[in-house]
Amino acid sequence: MRRPVVMGNWKLNGSKAMVTDLLNGLNAELEGVEGVDVVVAPPAMYLDLAERLIKEGGNKLILGAQNTDTHNSGAYTGDMSPAMLKDFGASHIIIGHSERRDYHKESDEFVAKKFAFLKENGLTPVFCIGETEAQNEAGETEAVCARQINAVIDAYGVEALNGAIIAYEPIWAIGTGKAATADDAQRIHASIRALIAAKDAAVAEQVIIQYGGSVKPENAASYFAQPDIDGALVGGASLDAKGFAAIAKAAAEAKKA
């Protein structure tokens, strides 16, 4: 059985006090919780503080990050390299998020390049895919997701997905309070796994596929009850220790062997 992964994307939120309170709270809430990997991705300038607090808390959490560059050094003002992220203990790196694709005009091909560079540097890509509301209403969800995934497969082979995480996030559900139903999310997750299985069944069977988009303690269990939903990429709800821990506990409970 695939081990669920629940990841908190803090986006552009945080302060020293907030990071300290949130991670101390999570360390307490997750005491004794097993069967789930819990990852947090704070803003880059708080990675050092987060790494120290995670260690002090007994390493119940895994440190992640929200972005990477496609170089490890050089004249790339404002960017972060995989080598730098590793130096701070970050292992799970979000790429392809709709906010990066939209605000920073990151193409499928550029996201695929980031994906490959993370793998080359021994890090775990958390590869976000998903459709807009207009694409959803036009019945294009599966085609959009396939296009985004195939940008990686066509350039680097289906084997590149080994050890990676795919996060299906319908753009219309991110931070809106709207959410795909558990049945609808399962249908898309199953189509993603089938797309990969058509090329390599073993890769498809092991790849983690998270759902993201207004996941909350109140609805988390319904998603995790689905066979192809292997965790969640959580936004706003990850900024509350008790609520985020409840989501992680729901994943652990639902995916018990």
Swiss-Prot record:
**Biological process terms in GO annotation:** gluconeogenesis; glyceraldehyde-3-phosphate biosynthetic process; glycerol catabolic process; glycolytic process
Which InterPro entries does the protein's record reference? Aldolase_TIM, TIM_sf, TrioseP_Isoase_bac/euk, Triosephosphate_isomerase, Triosephosphate_isomerase_AS
**What keywords were assigned to this record?**
Cytoplasm, Gluconeogenesis, Glycolysis, Isomerase
Task: State the Gene Ontology terms under molecular function.
Answer: triose-phosphate isomerase activity
The answer to keyword Isomerase applying to this record is yes
Residues binding substrate are N9, W10, K11, G175, S214, G235, G236
Q: What the protein does? A: Involved in the gluconeogenesis. Catalyzes stereospecifically the conversion of dihydroxyacetone phosphate (DHAP) to D-glyceraldehyde-3-phosphate (G3P).
Its name, as the record gives it, is Triosephosphate isomerase
Record organism: Vibrio cholerae serotype O1 (strain ATCC 39315 / El Tor Inaba N16961)
